[in-house]
């Protein structure tokens, strides 16, 4: 789906291809996609709303809102079965979460023993390894804080679950669930009617399948990873991922982008 906006209006909106390759079901202009990491800008705007209200500072320590991060440690040396940790040279700040300089990582990455800990602890899947149930943001934050950081906060950049942790910060400061906060202050004012952490059953017909490109010497092909209406995004979830959990349409997300282009204003409302 392609959308072009000009002068606060949609100038072009068209679709081509399939929402399901197997059934040759065509993409629609209002098809619902998994927006994955395009969730991050929305979570970041939510944080800046709290900043504008004076409810947090970017230089505040994360542990001010999430006490579980007060005693977080940094990986020092060793192996996955026998390792040493040390205290960080400086505390993790809110701005470190916003800029991916927190020392956190992602479970799908490679090259460091801590990443394996993300998988065995359930952080990678956001599922408790014992109960097999999906974590909520509180449990996710506590589990993440129990694992070593890759490096001292602020030392360097590394893509990570930092924005997911900000989702929990929003819950603690606002006293509301993350999804309710987004609906009240972002989705409803921006008329983002098809944006949520799951796609309700009445919209499954518009929910596209998700594919991965498999590259090989004999030629590339598509592998279906998720089928619209049958995956974890097709029913209410416990894990409200601020880093990659939203589903939406291009028209909805265009409203969000238009608000940013208008210096925080949308249809006469000052959102940010």
Residue map of PLM features:
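Short, conserved catalytic-motif segment at the N-terminal edge
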Residues: 1-35, 55-57, 71-78, 83
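Active-site SXXK
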Residues: 8, 34-62, 163-171, 253-256
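PAS-family sensory/regulatory domains
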Residues: 63-68
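Surface-exposed, flexible loop/turn segments at secondary-structure boundaries
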Residues: 10, 43, 70, 105
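Short beta-to-alpha loop/turn elements within the nucleotide-binding domains of ABC transporters
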Residues: 14, 60, 176
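Short, surface-exposed loop or secondary-structure junction motifs
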Residues: 72-272
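Outer-envelope exported proteins of Gram-negative bacteria
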Residues: 1-5, 61, 160, 183
